[in-house]
Amino acid sequence: MLSPDEAPRGTVGIPRALNMYENYPFWHAFFTRLGFSVQLSDQSSKKTYQAGIESMPSESVCYPAKMSHGHVMNLIDRDVDFIWMPCVRWERKEDPTAGNCYNCPIVMSYPTALALNIDEIREQNIEFLYPFVPYHDKTELKRRLYQVLAVDRVADAEAGRGRVRGPKITRSEVDAAVNAAFEADARFHEDIQTMGEEALKWVEDHGGHGIVLAGRPYHNDPEINHALPELISSFGFAVFTEDSLAHLVKPERPIRVVDQWMYHSRLYAVARFVTMRNDLDLIQLNSFGCGLDALTTDQVQEILEASGKIYTVLKIDEVSNLGAARIRIRSLMAALKDQEAERLAEATAAGEAYEQGDAAPVAPSTDAPAFASRKYTFEAQRESASTAWPKVPFTEQMRDEGYTILCPQMAPIHFDLVKEVFRGAGYNLELLPSTDHDAVEAGLRYVNNDICYPSILVTGQIMEAIESGRYDLSKTAVVISQTGGGCRATNYIALIRKALRESGHPEIPVISLSAVALGEDNPGFKITPALLKQAVYAVLFGDVMMQMLYRCRPYEATPGAANALYEEYMARARKLAPKFNRHNYTKLCREAIRAFDTMPLVGEGTKPRVGVVGEILVKFHPTANNHVVDVIEREGCEAVVPGLLDFFLYSMSNAELQKDELGSSATTRAGMQALIKLVDWMRTPVEEMLEKSRRFEAPERIGTMAEKARTVLSVCNNMGEGWLLTAEMLDLIDHGAPNIICTQPFACLPNHVVGKAVIKELRRQHPESNIVAVDYDPGASEVNQLNRIKLMISVAKENMRAGKGFKLEKVAPLAMDEVTGQMRAHDDCVSCGPASEEAVTSVAKRLGRGIKK
């Protein structure tokens, strides 16, 4: 390690937080080789936590993430040249049989939240580097680190942002430093594994017992684990970390969950290893607010209990009272003693029976390999149940027999048409109800209650239908989308399969609807190009109808007229959906736009516009968001909900957008760009109609949305709704809807960053923005949600009276008296009351070409 005086290129500060507990040996070796003095933030303490508490954008994020704020503050106080905390989407894959090697959304992108919310970074001009880096790809990593440190950082310094010392960094130096860092990282992990093997050998030789304290790397922080390793050791156990033994065996696959997070792969492997040993048991550490652990805890529990092992989980957060933990550990000790007594009795009985010739010796288990150890050979001591989970495929015969395919509701306007597209293609698709409070109760019965609200609602919809008696379960299947990303949504399918088995229906096929290969095979369910095209038109039409309905309904001259017009055109669209093409889709849209554009309205544009963004299901599903659009309209406002299609375009655009930061396949990029161009071609005629209309606007293209997002964060933030959520808020502000409800499931991991964490920066860039984040889950108080929304709306109305954030280019009537033709600027507006002089001036200035007689 170089001291600051020995380092020709200055000092780099690294926070002792999150994935640095995994990656620090790599970064220490890398920067030391380049000639930097590496300064690690001080050890965590309550003081560390308190130092960062004012900058935390979300109180429901996990304790390890909260702690990182204090570590950055510690480095700011130490005046290092720059702070290094890269965003790492993928770890290096340790188990080639695992589905992927993601970091969780918080570990991946929380440095973004730190940069946007710690005021000292901006106020003191701190150089805080948090680039996305392809940590999993050695070649791409060399390219990216050279760009960040030798090109971008120098340019920033020349612009007055940061300070660069010493000689210019060359590409060959970066390459050599990366090679050295890979070697140091490999030695670090080999040392941990060797120490784990030696400790296990000691346990074996001395007749001891070990506890695998399984969690994530940052659970090794004594402040985060609250000295639990020492507590367990005080009871006479040897304590192992999950990564010290996970290399010794791999789980049999496929396991039930989609194994796509690298730290989790270790949990499943070490749980499997524990089931093969009499001298090991496992305690899992779970941080409060870690939604992914709702998946891992269930899976680890299944692996252990299937083999007769005891599962124990300890939830930890900032509260350090270990009384409950001591009780759980003592309970585990008592249970282990009981098990040991039973094993001894069984062994004694078996020995006596064998001596009498009444029983044959037990044959060695075929599931007892010698493990891949470097120093020792560890044999399985006990039989272990298979971890493989059988999948039931949806066959062509099932399709031909007309199986009912249950599809959970997400976006009622759009899915109403998508259902007809699939039915026209020969699938007996049954769309489940959109108003289904019983589904919430069913979900809570079958799903770990720490999982996110959409997971509960999706699983609950299906299980309520399964248990309703409405369907012939011998001819029923389920379809669910899988994104393949690092959000929990990819594991909806695992939750549904678990619920079906627990309800006694493991034979029901669960079909994966996904654009990526995730190990699912359903020969009876194929998405053809024709079906895909019609589905896109269905979503496009849903977006158009949603915009027009929400735009007109608050001002309809005749109550119910907007809904009646909506139902008329939706009925026509349902009949047309299985035959949708560019011609008939465009013709139907032309007629619908003309009808909505000319329907009689009263006081058009006199109500504040309130945008609705957020996690995709909560944003669109009325049950999930407690009918938020109805609430907005009931409070005298106009709802603006960005369309559904953009979510799919966002997903398709990521390969192109992340190529410089993370690298991506040229073939994938070309394919996705071709699809985006095709969709743009499909919707261009209708966009032109919307632009020519008096009341409506065409949505921005996805490339424009990405550029908006870049003003706040990296477009590599692409887990969940990712950068699109931020872009939608910016777009709403730009189009006269600065009042925004950010709907999100309680503890939605991506939304901690791309939702809650960006609000402060949006307010800084756009002082007129009026944003409220509202959490939704089964236990959330609807009264609390309503109070937060009503408070935001009261501010919206006050701002509208003052002319703040008011921008409606296409609304003439609001500013023109229909009788005299004089500018009224909201006088006697039913929503706002008399207008101020400031409002009159503001409206006159902003309306521009929108004023028509």
What residue ranges belong to the model's regions?
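An N-terminal assembly and electron-transfer interface module characteristic of large anaerobic redox
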Residues: 1-853
